[in-house]
Amino acid sequence: MITRVLVANRGEIARRVFASCRRLGIETVAVHSDADAGLPFVAEADVAVRLPGNAPSETYLRGELIIAAAKRTGADAIHPGYGFLSENADFARDVEAAGLIWIGPAPESIDAMGSKIEAKAAMEAAGVPILTVSDPVGPGDFPVLIKASAGGGGRGMRIVRRAEDLDAERAIAEAEAVSAFGDGTVFVEPYVERSRHVEVQVVGDGRGDVLVFGERDCTVQRRHQKVIEEAPAASVPADVAAALHEAARKAAASISYRGAGTVEFLYDPDALSEGSPGGVPPGAFFFLEMNTRLQVEHPVTELVHGVDLVELQLAVAEGRGLESPASGVNGHAIEVRLYAEDETWTPQSGRLITLDIRADAAFGPLARAGIRVDSGFESGNEVGTHYDAMLAKVISWAPTRQQAIRQLVTALRRARIHGVVTNRDHLIEILSTADFGADEVTTTWLESADLPAAVPDVRLAA
């Protein structure tokens, strides 16, 4: 049995893991940089260990310091959260070599999915649909998308529409990939013009059994980075959703996946009108990648399925079996990421004088329709420049999608946020569009969307 968990992370995700551990009677250990010493996650842990310095390379990316902290504080397991070392197979191996429990997939699974080129080959062998293009790229293959094999988040990614631009764009993508990931390997695949981003949550026991907890729609993106996530994917027909779930299950089972993971797909709604009735046509969806960790957007799945994904991670890490969920989808959940950033999406820093978002729950389930807020900050905290600028995830859960949207807009309008500029108004504008309300968006929709001006809450203006 796990008795004490060190979370090799910071902020909101550390608090999220601590919340499940407290409920289960498991003690917790935080590691923190100097800049993070005053943040809530440090105070909430049973034990806190300083990692001298501020830059990630000095602190949260120093695997040897984190393992030493776990040994020194008597932790018997390490949870990586997301980002930092969460998908570093060598760190996972080092954790296990130190005699500690790694709350995550086997290092071999991380390796298998770490390279997009190798992952696509493995998924094709498992019978999961993938995007392919001829090599070399022919005149009839355009438009195409150049992608970094080792990365994500839009870095090392270029859309090419003309053959004469291919070499130059490939060189730019390779340079971006080297800068961001230390690996300039890129590959080319067809570019789907009107696509949606749909992902499936899986939890595996490491022995081939895999539970599927439905799909999430992460189509609203900015520069290939997710802005809004929701579950279930309302625009996906039931037969396509079932096919996505089965493809994700096969993907995870093929690598004997252990723990929580997400299989991401590109969904092409236009392919449905071109296919024949009576089944899901070829080309309806394609494998993109598998994230071998807990996702930022996991709360929407937890709310509609009534499940604690961190608890399941802990259960699998302890070697316990998985039980099928008692119920299916209940209602609709939508999550927005509240960032300290200006209208040009430039990260902001400074003292967060006030952060007051009315919530019915934090880091856990909702008893009824309402708002959940998962945040790494509180009023009075300092927002620094060393890490991601996300202040909070604001999640709405309701019986219907329209009610969830209304609740979320109201919560954002009524939120009191002072001291740093945020994207709060931008989020309200997106949620208030007719396109979003009708669920008629694509992965590039936000680039040209006609956004209405955010309407302030009159009670706050008075």
Question: Positions of the model-derived regions?
Answer:
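N-terminal beta-alpha lobe that positions the nucleotide/phosphoryl donor
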Residues: M1-V263, Y267-N291, Q295
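Catalytic cores of soluble metabolic enzymes centered on carboxylation/carboxyl-transfer
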Residues: P299-E302, V307-A462
